[in-house]
Amino acid sequence: MSGERAKRFPLALEDLKRAPRKSEGRPGERQTAGAVPKAADKPAAVLKPVAVKPAAVRAPLPGIAAAKPATAPKPTALKPALPKPAAPSIAPAGAFALTSERVRERMVERLRANGVTDARVLDAMAAVPRHLFVDPGLATQAYEDSALPIGHQQTISKPSVVARMIELAMAGRTLERVLEIGTGCGYQAAVLSHVARDVYSIERIKPLYERAKLNLRPLRVPNIRLHYGDGRVGLPSAAPFDAIVIAAAGLDVPQALLEQLAIGGRLVAPVGAQSGQHQVLTLVERVAHAQWRESRLDRVFFVPLKSGVI
């Protein structure tokens, strides 16, 4: 033992030179040391299938990913398919019923039967889509001869009343400049724009003023000028007017409006108590600088004419 130990530790130069040969010829301890690298090689061989397994796992992933796009269109294809049947049964049918010229023609036929004879007034009533000026929930009633609420305790006048007032204001004339008091939703201003060169309209309720602008915008009416202000004051900067149409009832006609009426001009307004029980459609004609002639015509019902703005 001691001799062998002395031989190995430290090794002589010639032993070092012979060391490789001893590792091949002696299977003792050095063979065990040589087995370690072989064991290290074995995990490498074991790792290769492990490396293949992720590849085998990845291989189906593209197949699954490819299957998802194939199934994804199915729900998207079903979603549009559901509204498509509903759309033709509701929207187009309703839009056609409301916008068809035939519906407005029937309204015009009723106006003619009720005594409106001016062809220009009838054409103007037929040209303006009244359903665009009322709430969507009331659109189906737009061409009935009834007043409809537009909010803020205001209403859109009956088609028969609108046609009657405009016909009285025109009296067969061609109107150059017209003033409307009470824009409301903008419907009467739109009708007036077809029979007058320039239409000025005043609204004292700011939300209605804004709503009228929105309602008139799609129609692209170039000759209407909307103003937010007190209608009882009128619009002196644009006076005189060939005609003034007041869409609210006061106990009398404001003097400021009478002064803004051109000589030979005509003013049409409901006059009477705010309760509406004794309101009468009144025609005022200016016959001279300081002279007006008044005619009391039809029983009507309008919202009250108020001063100021809100």
Swiss-Prot record:
The active site is at S157. The lineage of its organism: Bacteria, Pseudomonadati, Pseudomonadota, Betaproteobacteria, Burkholderiales. It comes from the Bacteria. This is Protein-L-isoaspartate O-methyltransferase. Belongs to the methyltransferase superfamily. L-isoaspartyl/D-aspartyl protein methyltransferase family. It catalyses: [protein]-L-isoaspartate + S-adenosyl-L-methionine = [protein]-L-isoaspartate alpha-methyl ester + S-adenosyl-L-homocysteine. PROSITE patterns: PCMT. GO terms for molecular function: protein-L-isoaspartate (D-aspartate) O-methyltransferase activity. One of its GO terms (biological process) is methylation. Its EC number is 2.1.1.77. Residues 14-29 have a biased composition (Basic and acidic residues). Its main location: cytoplasm. The gene is pcm. Catalyzes the methyl esterification of L-isoaspartyl residues in peptides and proteins that result from spontaneous decomposition of normal L-aspartyl and L-asparaginyl residues. It plays a role in the repair and/or degradation of damaged proteins. InterPro entries: PCMT, SAM-dependent_MTases_sf. Keywords: Cytoplasm, Methyltransferase, S-adenosyl-L-methionine, Transferase. GO terms for cellular component: cytoplasm. Residues 1-41 are annotated as: Disordered. It is found in: Cytoplasm. It comes from Burkholderia cenocepacia (strain HI2424).
